[in-house]
């Protein structure tokens, strides 16, 4: 009986900690499947100094979560999910491409074929300032061209 209770408790605990699918909606109502990982946890700040050495012109903003990425952070503001691709925000017409530079804060910068997303936080600087989640790491602010991602940068707005 005791062994059975331990097994049931283990199964209950595992079920409570399972990954789950979360649906987020674009402003036009398109549904995007995201993942909420059971193992999502606040990152240690021990690597911030090392990142700062590698990118001295970037400003550390805040601690990130391990199973959250740039797309979820930039497009939804959430740190509890992982979004594989934000392309529906554009393809359904919720956001439109902006020619040239961003025109206001809060617009979204996208690198290459949606390899990275960031929030424009100062469109008026020569190199527009963006705030973004670097992979599964922390949240940083820097000039868009200074971010550690490659590809042409496109800006999107509502």
Give the role of each language-model region.
Residues 73-75, 95, 155-156:
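Aromatic side chains
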Residues 1-9:
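Sec-dependent, cleavable N-terminal signal peptides
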Residues 13, 17-22, 31-33, 38, ...:
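Active-site or metal-binding loop neighborhoods of secreted/extracellular toxin and effector enzymes
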Residues 83-140:
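...with weaker cross-activation on analogous glycine-rich loops/strands in unrelated enzymes
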Residues 9-91:
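N-terminal capping segments
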């Amino acid at each position: 009986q005791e062994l059975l209770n331990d097994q049931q408790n283990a199964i209950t605990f595992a079920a409570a900690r399972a990954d789950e699918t979360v649906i987020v909606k674009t402003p036009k109502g398109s549904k995007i499947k995201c993942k909420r990982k059971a193992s999502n946890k606040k990152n240690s700040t021990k690597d911030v100094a090392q990142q700062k050495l590698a990118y001295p012109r970037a400003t550390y903003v805040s601690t990130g979560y391990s199973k959250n990425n740039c797309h979820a952070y930039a497009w939804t503001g959430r740190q509890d999910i992982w979004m594989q691709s934000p392309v529906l925000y554009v393809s359904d017409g919720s956001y439109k491409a902006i020619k040239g530079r961003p025109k206001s804060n809060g617009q979204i910068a996208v690198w290459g074929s949606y390899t990275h997303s960031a929030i424009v936080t100062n469109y008026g600087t020569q190199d527009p300032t963006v705030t973004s989640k670097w992979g599964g790491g922390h949240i940083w602010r820097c000039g868009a061209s200074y971010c550690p991602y490659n590809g042409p940068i496109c800006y999107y707005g509502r």
